[in-house]
Regions:
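Short alpha-helix within the catalytic core of nucleotide-sugar-dependent glycosyltransferases
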Residues: 92-95, 102
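N-terminal regions that are enriched for targeting/export leaders
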Residues: 4, 8-31, 39
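Conserved catalytic core of two-metal-ion nucleotidyltransferases
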Residues: 22, 32-56, 101-157
């Protein structure tokens, strides 16, 4: 498998690449963005690529939502102080995604929601890249030096 590629069910997905300057701290709209936030954003985009792969494979439409939609329109990307990605799916597609995703996700990924966690109190799901913080070199490489758990909030519409 070529460097920078991920394997999903015999299919290859190329890892996102970023110029090193992307990860430098910067001030946008009067708000300082730490380099680690940039690493977290890049890691979230990797998780989003997995979602996109599954949705494309199974013809499941999704849309940017909440701060992600606002950031795309108003800031041309992330809102400087936002720390997550939000998407939504029509209810039937959302239910289908929740049924399909566990079979398609990389083993370290998992979905948290009211169906999977007894104490979960939100009306949306979170697709997470891991269950623990890790400084393992493979994970740091895969998620652009971000050791933290990152995920995507998925809202039913």
């Amino acid at each position: 498998m070529p460097h920078g590629a991920k394997q999903y069910e015999g299919e290859q997905i190329t890892m996102l690449t970023f110029d090193d300057s992307y990860f430098l701290g910067e001030t946008r709209d009067g708000f300082y963005i730490e380099p680690m936030m940039k690493c977290a954003w890049a890691a979230q985009l990797e998780v989003m690529c997995v979602i996109q792969h599954i949705c494309k494979k199974y013809d499941i439409p999704y849309f940017a939502d909440w701060g992600t939609l606002l950031g795309a329109v108003r800031h041309g990307g992330f809102i400087p102080w936002d720390d997550d990605i939000d998407i939504c799916m029509f209810r039937d597609d959302y239910q289908r995604f929740l049924a399909i995703a566990p079979k398609e996700l990389p083993t370290e990924y998992h979905i948290n929601n009211a169906y999977t966690e007894e104490e979960y109190s939100f009306v949306f799901s979170r697709l997470l890249n891991a269950s623990t913080i890790s400084y393992d070199s493979k994970r740091l490489s895969q998620f652009h030096r971000c050791p933290y758990i990152v995920g995507i909030d998925i809202f039913p519409l």
